Design a protein with these regions (language model features):
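Terminal amphipathic alpha-helical/low-complexity segments used for targeting or macromolecular assembly
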Residues: 1-83
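Structural signal for interior beta-strand "rungs" in well-ordered beta-sheet cores
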Residues: 82, 86-132
């Protein structure tokens, strides 16, 4: 991606605030536009965007509630690393729209931002920051 394509991608991306919510319901509740996973009687784990989850939480009562969230109005999600043919250590941060070459090594604490290209067999050391 060139600089203009990156700017346009960020500008037009839907901004999201993903949350994971653990709830113990007093009465059954549905979370529209969210993924719900039962976790026992009256308990569930909910994945969704804050704009969809917040109204449900405000308009219902729960016995217990815990919310996890790690970003706000984020334009670029993290890279799905499951099928990347490289070694990526815990704590490395890779955004979508990066290219990671075969057998590359990304050490913990490295940050690989949108548009960056890491060549085949390349090692990115701890604390390195690469951008496109």
């Amino acid at each position: 991606m060139n600089a203009q394509e990156i700017i346009e991608y960020i500008r037009t991306s839907e901004k999201k605030t993903p949350v994971k919510v653990y709830v113990w319901e007093k009465t059954p509740v549905t979370f529209p536009n969210c993924r719900e996973f039962p976790a026992g009687e009256g308990c569930k784990i909910v994945f969704g965007d804050w704009k969809d989850v917040k109204p449900v939480l405000e308009n219902n009562e729960f016995s217990h509630l815990e919310i996890e969230n790690d970003c706000r109005n984020s334009a670029i999600p993290l890279l799905d690393m499951k099928d990347i043919p490289a070694r990526i250590e815990p704590g490395a941060i890779l955004r979508e729209q990066v290219e990671i070459g075969k057998n590359a090594v990304i050490m913990m604490g490295a940050v690989i931002n949108i548009g960056a290209i890491v060549g085949e067999g390349t090692m990115i050391d701890m604390g390195a920051v690469l951008g496109g």
